[in-house]
Amino acid sequence: YNFDSRSAVLQHTWTKSPKTIWLFRFSASHSLTSSLEAAQDKLDYPHQLGLKGLFSGIFPTFRFGNYLGLGPRNNSVFKESSYAFTPYVSGSLNRKAHTVRLTHTTRRNFDNIFSPFAPAGYFTFGNAMTALPGIKNTGNAFASFLLGEVYNGEESIVRHPSYYRKNFYNFIASDEYKVRPGLTASVSVNFEVASPRTEKYNRQSTVSFSHINPANGKPGALIFAGREGIGAALQPTTVRAEPTIGLSLSPFSNRKTVVRFSYGLSYQSVPLYGRHFGTQGFNAAALFISRNDQLESAFRLRDGVPQNFELPPFLDPTAANGTDADFVDPSGRLPAVHQWVVGIQRELP
């Protein structure tokens, strides 16, 4: 694959006085990653193989049990272009026994990606179709391939790239107080505000358990961003405060020994889900599974790939039925980490 990365940083330090220093920084970065297989699309390998029903010209993927397979690996066709812009401001103010630090960071992420899982199909062949009835360890997966009897298969249909956006804001205030020689206390509070992932054209979806699926009348239906009263984001904006306290002391006025105690609370962030997670309905992942792998294949290669599914865009509550549905947690709950640290530092002779 091809990889290109660029970044630029602009920084200025302003010393207002010996006790007050400000730092201003702005950074921008860009990375572009693309696969070489993307150029194969124009060759239309499925047509050359006589395999009908596929929506990409990439060479299909065939797997035969323990044999070496044919075709590219999954997600071999991709192009991802990511941008990040990060303004940063920090100030340090010394006032007698106090050192106060103020920090603010804003980060804007843009992730533009095209990466179908199996653009020209992923087809698996097993030994059951060529095995003798009731006799174990018979049959051959490659023989099933020669007969064209597909055990199971999947085809990814991604019509458009996904253009994800996410913002992050961070505010930190800390104070380091020298109580007396050999004793220092510190406290800080980190406020973080993180916006959820959005898509430039609202091409996002998730399973909602508060919506009824019309296929069976039970909770669990696909919902779509920007439709039927649903906002552009499928998760809430998270706001959290992360406090930290610490104490360092030199016992018995011994400057060669320092004991440190600290406690901190932090939260993990909701990731910027990449690839095409949470885009069902706008994209499709057609599955083909044998109902009885000893008697009937999912389909025969000579008949072409079945077309018994809705082509995207299919913005319907039932669009994820019968698939491995994507779920974007709408609760806004974040994993919390409580950390206690005790350390002893000793200067050796």
What is each of the regions a protein language model found here?
Residues Y1-P349:
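Short acidic-glycine motifs
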